[in-house]
Amino acid sequence: MTRNKPPSLFKTRHAAQVHFVGLGGIGMSGIAEVLLNLGYRVSGSDLRESDITRRLVRMGATFFEGHRAQNLIQADVVVISSAVRKDNPEVVAARQRKIPVIPRAEMLAELMRLKYAVAVAGSHGKTTTTSMVATVLSAAGLDPTAVVGGKVNVLDSNAKLGKSELMVVEADESDGSFLHLHPSIAIVTNIDPEHMDHYGDLDTLQSAFVEFCNRVPFYGLNVLCLDNPNVQALLPRIEKRFVTYGSSHMADYRLENIQLDGFTTRFNAYRREESLGEFRVRMVGAHNAFNALAVIAVAEEMDIPLETVRESLAEFGGVQRRFTVRGEAQGITVVDDYGHHPTEVLATLAGARRAFGRRVVVAFQPHRYTRTHDLMKEFTTSFNDSDVLFVTSVYAAGEERIHGATGDALADAVRAHGHRDVTFVEKRTDLPAALLPRLREGDLVLTLGAGDITHVGPELLELLRTTPLAKD
């Protein structure tokens, strides 16, 4: 079968126009930014303007609010994400005009084609690990191009055009499109049974990861987390070279003695029995020590000086919406985090509890009805490290409502499984007012979720600055 691919685009960059349907998406915008920096003409549409689209317009992109056939103008290729429906008017018009329509991952693969690429895949930790790899390679003077699924604080962007032949990308497994990629080095952080609406079962998901790992060339490398049973189960089926990392003594790269101290995580790293010394990252949670260990493994295999790795990880400024402090008022610290899967919630709350030793108040917004439905059982025990839990309605992300997969049903289920302080607040906008009377000086408030829960932190801080806390 012949694929719709635009090879001519990369020979005529100054004449070619690439149109993105869903330009404001975090994955789409990163590719668009790299293409703009390479000299391509970029246009795109989305349902509404955002900080992301405004940034791209300042860089030279043309933005259309709303999806219409006339937005295509002189597009040579149309790029879509898995969230774009087949009946989208721009997609329909492109097909009628015989303009190639390709998935986001295929355009990313075209950018990677002539590069030595590192791709980071896994259910959790992709964005942080991708950002760490890019940071370490940059510190080593290798100046990679990077396309990340989140805004890297030091870049204030999710993309960077480098001058070298190296590229670092985040590989999205959600719809199987990461199988378009052919990385030289592949990292797999973990595998959890998610995106079952696409894969159907865990075996099919694992098979996709096996195929991804076997796409590296004969001179390439896979870096696999041995602590994750679903990743370890892949090892007999991996035909290309791999190294493992984790806390197990069977791992090629091992960590020990994880220490959480406020916003810093420290650990000792080993390559087999050889000590590599202590490392620290300015991030909360043992899971970030594992992310850093994967980066150490890549750097060691690429012969990057160990001290460069140590220093750059210590200076790594993190990624937005990954335990990001939004502010402090009346002795209450407000933090925002993207965590929306039970594993992510569990790790983030455990890190917060261990690192700060303070009362943890959580406001959680479930993300997608399918995820809430499929992982309801796992969610019920994910909030044990919170002292007070507020749950709001599901952020649909375009999905149809599923009976029983609602925010109030989740709150009831968590309560039924033993949590003693759970409150359901239907409207996200009512959360700040609901939280305020429950807060005490010294509390850590954590807003969790991949939707618009991120707005609650600033709204709560504004309220705290104008309204005294209730007396005990």
UniProtKB/Swiss-Prot annotation:
> Main site of residence?
cytoplasm
Q: Which GO terms describe its molecular function?
A: ATP binding; UDP-N-acetylmuramate-L-alanine ligase activity
Q: What is its EC number?
A: 6.3.2.8
GO annotation (BP), single: regulation of cell shape
Function, as annotated, reads:
Cell wall formation.
* Similarity comment: Belongs to the MurCDEF family.
Q: What is this protein called?
A: UDP-N-acetylmuramate--L-alanine ligase
Q: Which organism is it from?
A: Myxococcus xanthus (strain DK1622)
